[in-house]
Amino acid sequence: PSFMDLVEKHFNESITFGNELKPDYVLDQAASQASGDNTNPQVNFAQADALLKYCGENQIPVRGHTLVWHSQTPDWFFKENFSDDGDWVDKDTMLKRMENYIKNVMEGLATQYPDVEFYAWDVVNEAWLDDGNPRKAGSSKSEDSNSSAWVRIFGDNSFIEYAFQYARKYAPKNCKLYYNDFNEYMPGKTTAIYNMAMELKEKGLIDGIGMQSHLDVGFPTASTYRKAIDKFASTGLDIQVTELDITTSD
């Protein structure tokens, strides 16, 4: 059998694109500037087209990954006139951009790829540091990987709730919405994710937590990992292992 035959036989329940639906693959700078609307970023699915068509033709559901992330999100998305050298926009402008971006992604996919079922979306990805604090104010070009342009604009992690509000508003009816993160078993991060998830759950905005689970045979211990799972499960939300890999020290 061919490689694709094996995919269709053994991995036909779900596919997550590694990069093709991330902001820097989907956002279209030239079209955004040409639109004349400073609050309406345009999107283009050209780089995801082959995968989307494949999933539609083979009836393989897709987990959307990801909408709001500090990484692989171009700085021009946060700047005046969608320009690389523009000034950083204010919070109100960025909220409008966030809503229109999520709207354009959801509606564009539904219109252009009606045969593709998006059963889930990672709405926000990796917003908390290991100690449970928000990322630092920065940009996608910062040498500090702990920095975020979202935090630069909003001052904190308040953008998370807005992202889930807009995703809930525009996502397909039965699509589940997730928060996704790595090192989710670090105590400070576990607590931050738990508290955030409970607040979002009370408002009906979140359906589950994605545990990336980039593990090593030496860390975390099984009991540490289990403790995080139990903590997240106590929210009553769906818990999914989303990016599992286990490395060895040798």
Locations of regions flagged by a protein language model:
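Charged helix-capping and loop-helix junction motifs
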Residues: 44-47, 192-195, 221-228
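Short amphipathic alpha-helical segments and helix-helix/interface helices
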Residues: 4, 49-52, 164, 197, ...
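Active-site glycine- and acidic-residue-rich loops that bind
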Residues: 155-158, 185-193, 215-223
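Substrate-binding cleft and catalytic face of glycoside hydrolase catalytic domains
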Residues: 13-31, 37-178, 182-184, 248
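Short, acidic/polar
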Residues: 2-10, 98-108, 187-200, 225
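Substrate-binding surface in catalytic domains of secreted glycosidases
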Residues: 135-144, 214-228, 232, 245-249
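Glycine-enriched alpha-helix->loop->beta-strand junction motifs that scaffold or abut catalytic
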Residues: 11-15, 205-206, 235-238
